[in-house]
A protein has these predicted regions:
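Cell-wall polysaccharide-cleaving catalytic domain and substrate-binding groove, primarily
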Residues: 1-185
Length: 185
């Protein structure tokens, strides 16, 4: 199943407990924020709200229920599903959807496809149909993935440009981008 591969990829990038003062997400464990853990608790996915006590199995279930399925990564081919899932974990569902929509529009323009989607942060039926059309056109999934990774790198750099306090995270973010690129090779 693609989820297990994608989960392993994400766990390879996400560390244990962290509470960096500049991290806008606050305290995290294995990439799960305290806010996401509270949401998972309210939905009955986990039985506690202690971010430090989060287990790998609990994190995996949170990722499956709150990120994998809602991001629609489960509807994408490999390796795009892994890249998109990793992005959803790192940027949230809406952020990942916007990057995918920008990718669709960028790829369509490069390929000469006459389609575009709204960059609204919602991967609805129109966006998913456009993604499917892009994937089927010339079967160039590798290029779609490259564009997606490039859009993600631009996003990281824009975060730092807009808020220099986030520069302390740029090296780690770019390491994650490099890991995304290695997935394609």
């Amino acid at each position: 199943m693609n989820f297990e591969k994608a989960l392993s990829f994400v766990f390879g990038s996400e560390g244990g407990y962290s509470n960096h003062p500049n991290d806008r997400g606050g305290a995290t464990n294995m990439g799960i924020t305290a806010g996401t853990l509270a949401r998972a608790y309210k939905q009955g996915i986990v039985k506690h709200q202690n971010i430090k006590a989060l287990t790998r199995a609990e994190a995996a279930e949170i990722y499956r229920v709150l990120y994998w399925r809602p991001s629609k990564a489960d509807k994408m081919p490999e390796p795009l599903c892994t890249l998109h899932f990793d992005t959803a974990v790192n940027h949230g569902l809406g952020g990942a959807a916007k990057l995918m929509q920008k990718t669709i529009n960028n790829y369509a323009a490069k390929a000469g496809l006459k389609l575009s989607v709204a960059v609204d942060g919602e991967l609805g039926p129109k966006s998913m149909a456009a993604l499917d059309a892009c994937i089927k056109y010339r079967h160039n999934l590798h290029l779609i993935c490259e564009i997606y990774i490039n859009e993600r790198e631009k996003y990281f750099r824009a975060i730092v440009a807009a808020n220099p306090s986030q520069a302390c995270f740029l090296k780690g973010w770019l390491n994650r981008i490099a890991k995304n690129r290695r997935l394609l090779s």
